């Protein structure tokens, strides 16, 4: 059963535009490869943090809405956690 999820992740601010897009496409491709469907991607761009995170003052924000199985969302969470380019992330299951 496909469920609706939202993921927000913050990428390292020193990545160039090409590398940033390739990372976004990599996570999108992973969801689609597992049988999920990405419904929306919002690129918020670089924003300043309220406080330092990993000695950084800003990051590139991305919000992605998708439909997928629970296992796919768990795998995405794992990949975001181990990626060196991701500063912070959160995966949320949206209520009906």
Curated annotation (Swiss-Prot):
Q: Which NCBIfam families match?
A: S6
Cite the SUPFAM superfamilies for this sequence: Ribosomal protein S6
A GO BP entry is: translation
Keywords, comma-separated and alphabetical? Ribonucleoprotein, Ribosomal protein, RNA-binding, rRNA-binding
Q: What does this protein do?
A: Binds together with bS18 to 16S ribosomal RNA.
InterPro entries (UniProt xref): Ribosomal_bS6 (IPR000529), Ribosomal_bS6_sf (IPR035980), Ribosomal_S6_plastid/chlpt (IPR020814), Transl_elong_EF1B/ribsomal_bS6 (IPR014717)
Kindly provide the name given to this protein in its UniProt entry.
Answer: Small ribosomal subunit protein bS6
Q: Name one Pfam family in it.
A: Ribosomal_S6
Enumerate the PANTHER family for this protein. MITOCHONDRIAL 28S RIBOSOMAL PROTEIN S6, SMALL RIBOSOMAL SUBUNIT PROTEIN BS6M
Assigned protein family: Belongs to the bacterial ribosomal protein bS6 family.
The terms under GO molecular function for this entry are: small ribosomal subunit rRNA binding; structural constituent of ribosome
The record's GO CC annotations read: cytoplasm; ribonucleoprotein complex; ribosome
């Amino acid at each position: 059963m496909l469920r609706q999820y939202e993921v927000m992740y913050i990428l390292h601010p020193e990545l160039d535009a090409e590398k940033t897009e390739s990372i976004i496409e990599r996570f999108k491709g992973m969801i689609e490869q597992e049988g999920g469907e990405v419904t929306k991607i919002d690129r918020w761009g670089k924003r300043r943090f309220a406080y330092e995170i990993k000695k950084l003052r800003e990051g590139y924000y991305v919000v992605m809405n998708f439909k997928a199985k629970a296992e796919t969302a768990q795998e995405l969470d794992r990949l975001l956690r181990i990626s060196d380019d991701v500063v912070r992330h959160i995966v949320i299951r949206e209520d009906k």
